[in-house]
């Protein structure tokens, strides 16, 4: 999809299995919301095809463009779009009375009652919308999207307007609800933790393209390129070159400014190949003594210590490299203190420079 000068979405392709939860994750302007709006029928792509189930709802080559109200999708917007002049019941009932999925009036009350029960607001049907809290408005918006039993649920950053604590609670409630309903879901967010908690699959986007798609575990532990590694969580990067096999356990030796690092990559690497090694701050073990294994163990000096409640964020100078680490909040470190840093080979990823 393009505005004539810049392609907002390029070559994006994905499939959501029935009942699965797929998240489009990326920074602002990466094309994730545009992609969702194309699926919803609120934007028209320049080319390609979109299928919802077995139904073709868009095809550039065949001239098919099913309007949004006929696609059978439920959508929750970032702003919730709750009508202030209506009650909770009237907001949820709207698509059954005025939308493209009208049902006999005799069925409206029961459908709305079930939808409100699903989201825990069965007692608030008569309440005016302006009297709802932010969390309640989010639930009403979700009930309205589910009341006509759509085949696909689309959610565009629905939790971003909530405070941090309520957002965490709503993540779990939303995932539990989706599991109960077994409804296919496409979710858009820039929040990495939100994507990891909610999703069966994550597609990381940048500049209108999907850079990597996989399970939350794959995306976090096995990033394919530096952008995915740094955008999804924090990461340490160190450039190096492959030296060869190191030991009988299949570890690969990589020469880096830290020294020789032994890695357990899932890639076939050649001697002399230029790579970047990547490891997470929580996988950097810090000790105040010099004991430990000789593999991937280096002396360092603490340059910065930040207490954040449940953990300590610290920066440790190892040679010419500044290594980030996250450690238990009860572990005592002082700026300028000498420490030993150890990184397990199994916790080190390898990214080819050509990627």
Where are these regions (language model features)?
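Glycine/charge-rich catalytic "coupling/switch" loops of P-loop NTPases
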Residues: 221, 253-303, 330-355
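Conserved ABC transporter NBD signature motif
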Residues: 48-60
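ABC ATPase nucleotide-binding domains
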Residues: 72-74, 78, 82-230
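Helix-to-loop junction immediately C-terminal to a conserved catalytic motif
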Residues: 40
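ABC ATPase nucleotide-binding domain
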Residues: 15, 51, 340-342
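Conserved coupling/switch loops of ABC nucleotide-binding domains, chiefly the family-specific signature
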Residues: 46-49, 207, 239
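The feature captures the beta-strand-to-loop junction immediately N-terminal to the Walker
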Residues: 25-27
């Amino acid at each position: 999809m393009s505005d004539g000068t810049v392609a907002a979405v390029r070559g994006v392709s994905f499939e959501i299995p029935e009942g699965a939860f797929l998240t489009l994750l990326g920074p602002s302007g990466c094309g994730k919301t545009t992609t969702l709006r194309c699926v919803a029928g609120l934007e028209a792509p320049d080319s390609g095809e979109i299928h919802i189930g077995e139904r073709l709802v868009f095809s550039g080559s065949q001239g098919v463009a099913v309007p949004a109200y006929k696609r059978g999708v439920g959508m929750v917007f970032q702003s919730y779009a709750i009508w202030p002049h209506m009650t909770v019941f009237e907001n949820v009932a709207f698509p059954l009375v005025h939308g493209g999925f009208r049902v006999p009036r005799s069925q409206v009350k029961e459908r709305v009652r079930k939808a409100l029960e699903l989201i825990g607001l069965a007692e608030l049907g008569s309440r005016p919308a302006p009297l709802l809290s932010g969390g309640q408005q989010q639930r009403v918006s979700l009930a309205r999207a589910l009341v006509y039993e759509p085949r696909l649920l689309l959610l565009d950053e629905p939790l971003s307007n909530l405070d941090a604590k309520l957002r965490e609670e709503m993540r779990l409630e939303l995932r539990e609800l989706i599991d109960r309903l077994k409804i296919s879901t496409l979710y858009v967010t820039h929040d990495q933790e939100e994507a990891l908690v909610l999703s069966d699959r994550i597609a990381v986007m940048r500049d209108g393209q999907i850079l990597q798609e996989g399970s939350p575990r794959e995306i976090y532990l096995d990033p394919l390129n530096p952008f995915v590694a740094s955008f999804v969580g924090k990461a340490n990067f160190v450039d190096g070159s492959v030296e060869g096999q190191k030991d009988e356990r299949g570890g690969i030796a990589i020469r880096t400014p830290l020294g020789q690092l032994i890695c357990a990559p899932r890639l076939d690497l050649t001697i002399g190949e230029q790579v970047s090694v990547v490891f997470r701050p929580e996988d950097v073990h810090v000790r105040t003594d010099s004991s430990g294994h000789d593999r991937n163990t280096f002396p360092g000096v603490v340059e910065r210590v930040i207490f954040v409640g449940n953990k300590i964020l610290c920066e440790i100078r190892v040679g010419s490299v500044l290594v980030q680490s996250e450690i238990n909040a009860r572990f005592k470190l002082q700026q300028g203190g000498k420490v030993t840093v150890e990184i397990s080979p199994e916790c080190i990823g390898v990214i080819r420079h050509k990627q």
